[in-house]
């Protein structure tokens, strides 16, 4: 479970095909009957389903050192996930032939 002020990120390719880590800060958390718990960021991401982000964060932390990484999904940036994502992005941009076809 995240709090206001925590950062979330997503690994994705930009328009030129370069892998990047898109980051934003959670500035609001709401809970409603219709949508459940959601995280809001100021600019980068639309309202995010909190359970999805929490599960993606858990999956990302569990993937460390196991040879895979989660891309195109939003996860919490913390002292484990952010350096792991940044190392993978550096590797993927240096080895684009090996990073193709990843999901």
Please give the residue ranges for each predicted region:
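Intrinsic-disorder-associated interaction segments
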Residues: 1, 15, 19, 64, ...
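Short coil-to-beta transition motif at edge beta-strands of beta-rich domains
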Residues: 1-13
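Short, solvent-exposed loop/turn segments that connect beta-strands within catalytic domains
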Residues: 14-19, 34-38
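Intrinsically disordered, low-complexity, charged/polar segments
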Residues: 43-103
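Short, solvent-exposed secondary-structure boundary/capping segments
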Residues: 30-45
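Short beta-strand-centered aromatic/proline hotspots
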Residues: 17-31
